[in-house]
């Protein structure tokens, strides 16, 4: 499988998927940390991949930037769609739109 | 670099109002307000601003740019 196919599979297999620096338990970058914090506050399940983990996949860090044509990490995907990076995720969280995207329109 | 960024955004989105603050010499805050953002998802709004900057500076140089985009209406009601 190419790196693009591996990314596609992660995005397909996880309704909410974040590509980040570090892990949710131990983020290695403030931006990644903030996205994880938002997802934790929403109390949703999410998949994550650590782009710094070369043992797991050395091609992921550059591959994800090509996948979305977005230059920075973290990157959040919901239902297979690229949502955005840290700034966008926080803005959508604050406006309530992110919860709607993940939980559905019935969310209160 | 600050004026360049402002100019590049202005060229890409001619009717945009661009507000740039450099707080500490490293981190840039950019606010872009334009009717061109009407009905466009946030991620596409950011792409409209970032794509021309990316070709000018490369992605790494822009890591420290915090971007906020608004339609005129959203800006008024923020």
Predicted regions and their residues:
Chain A
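Flexible, polar/low-complexity N-terminal or interdomain linker segments that lie immediately upstream
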Residues: 1-8
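Local sequence-structure signature of Cys/Sec-based thiol-disulfide redox active-site neighborhoods
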Residues: 8-46
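Acidic beta-strand-to-loop metal/phosphate-binding motif
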Residues: 19, 75-79
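Secondary-structure boundary/capping motif
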Residues: 27-28, 56, 85
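Thiol-based oxidoreductase modules, predominantly thioredoxin-like and allied folds used
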Residues: 43-60
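Thiol/disulfide oxidoreductase modules built on the thioredoxin-like
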Residues: 64-72
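Non-catalytic, surface beta->alpha helical segment in thiol-disulfide oxidoreductase systems
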Residues: 78-108
